[in-house]
């Protein structure tokens, strides 16, 4: 296997962009608002977002990639506006330092997928996760898999004071479509946040073309949250 765990390709292509972003963050206490970058003509210059395929053919079909276009407009990060499908059990997953994971109904990961997920998150990867339609069966399966993959860690509530709620878009509170207050959960490994999870959903199904999902109790303004999560994952 090629040593792609450290995401050397990502670092090489984005070092200048990341340096600019860090300087912007250190110079401003307010959320980052910068002018859009110039058009990019090479995919090698773009940040990529993986769309995990797992447990056979489960994938994030109903997770909208619309937030990636918002991200490019609201920050100076150069981003591919489309998800890149990638199998969790494939070596190629390590080419994507940020990925989304979603689905419906119950599922079980293979042993290879569990090993890959653990390696991915412990060696530099970041995962944004939510079930389609707030699916309770999927939520239960996901939590079981996290316990198997990371027996020494647990999902914890992310406080609203966390930078993830202010890094680009100010998000003072989270509510579902019924205006009920909700929260995000996160997985930390050695002090590093490597996963953000919403059981209500951040899929932004209104912008997920070709998806028949009802959205369930999806969090309001999911694209703004996703922009923040992606930016945080890149900068921290």
Language-model features and meaning:
Residues 2-17:
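Bacterial N-terminal signal peptides that target proteins for export
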Residues 14-26:
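Bacterial N-terminal signal peptides
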Residues 29-98, 104-105, 202-203, 209-236:
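Aromatic-Pro/Gly-enriched surface loop or interdomain linker
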Residues 34-36, 82-88, 110-116, 179-183:
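Alpha-helical scaffolding within the catalytic cores
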Residues 45-48, 63-64, 136-209, 216-227:
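An acidic, glycine-rich "communication" segment
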Residues 47, 94-98, 123-126, 190-194:
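Loop/turn elements at helix/coil->beta-strand transitions in domains of secreted/extracellular proteins
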Residues 52-55, 101-104, 130-133, 158-160, ...:
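Active-site-proximal beta-strand/loop segments in catalytic clefts of secreted hydrolases
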Residues 98-139:
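Short alpha-beta junction capping motif
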């Amino acid at each position: 296997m090629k040593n792609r765990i450290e995401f050397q390709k990502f670092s090489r292509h984005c070092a200048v962009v990341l340096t600019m972003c860090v300087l912007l963050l250190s110079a401003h206490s307010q959320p980052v608002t910068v002018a859009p970058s110039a058009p990019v003509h090479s995919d090698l210059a773009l940040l990529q977002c993986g769309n995990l395929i797992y447990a056979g053919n489960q994938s994030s079909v109903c997770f909208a990639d619309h937030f990636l276009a918002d991200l490019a407009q609201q920050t100076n990060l150069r981003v591919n506006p489309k998800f890149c499908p990638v199998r969790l059990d494939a070596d190629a997953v390590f080419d994507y330092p940020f990925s989304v994971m979603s689905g419906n109904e119950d599922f079980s990961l293979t042993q290879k997928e569990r090993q890959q997920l653990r390696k991915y998150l412990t060696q530099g990867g970041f995962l944004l996760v939510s079930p389609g339609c707030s699916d309770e069966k999927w939520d239960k399966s996901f939590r079981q898999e996290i316990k198997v993959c990371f027996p020494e860690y647990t999902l914890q509530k992310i406080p609203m004071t966390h930078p993830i709620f202010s890094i680009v878009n100010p998000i003072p509170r989270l509510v579902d479509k019924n205006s009920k207050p909700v929260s995000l959960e996160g997985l930390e490994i050695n002090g590093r946040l490597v996963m953000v999870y919403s059981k209500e959903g951040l899929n932004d199904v209104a912008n997920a073309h070709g998806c028949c999902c009802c959205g369930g109790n999806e969090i309001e303004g999911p694209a703004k949250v996703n922009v923040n999560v992606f930016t945080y994952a890149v900068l921290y």
